[in-house]
Amino acid sequence: ILPTATQYARNAIFSGLTPLDMEKKFPQYWKNDPDEGGKNLYEGEFLTEQLKRLGLNIKQEYYKITNFTSGKKLADNFKSLKNNDLTTIVYNFVDMLSHAKTEMDVVKELASNDKAYRSLTASWFKNSPLLDMIQQAQQLGFKLIITTDHGTINCKNPSKVIGDKNTSLNLRYKTGRSLTYEDKDVYAVKDPKKIGLPALNMSSSFIFAKNDLFLAYVNNYNHYVSYYRNTYQHGGI
């Protein structure tokens, strides 16, 4: 699904719907790019609605882990989940790490390239409650499905883009009116509904950065390029 960003991709996994259908059927849960507030606050509700739609009356629980303490607590009580028909766990660490590489100098040093980034992630995983939970799931005979909502890419080259003040902020995709961009650098969608995306207004379009490009505004272009070059981003192709 495009964009390869959490608010679109992970909500789609839990709802079993395209973003366009989520907006139509569950406006109380769906938020578009400019809307204020968290964009992934209703994953549990989306999952419950999908199970209802599929006619699955099962015992299920949903957990979102955003720090070590909550992960450790769930791991310590993992055996209590054995009576569930379905247990869903969202583990946010890897996504948080990619954001930290942009914002924190110490993480930039530790994950200076793809090899170092993978090594840092592997080191975390080996010492995390997540590995403990996976091992316990095996011991308890659970059927275990591991997936992700999107990947990430080390962005090395900028591509200029111009948009109005309401254009979305993501560096690998943009949605808005009157977007100006380099055709060769993006996959452009003039009619978002054709790929299952909601349109903010009649003239809204989407563009998705290709390869290792990131989209940089002409205003403050040099600042954008120096700050975001060699950072891990997602949302594009």
Predicted regions and their residues:
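Feature captures the catalytic ectodomains and active-site-proximal regions of enzymes
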Residues: 1-237
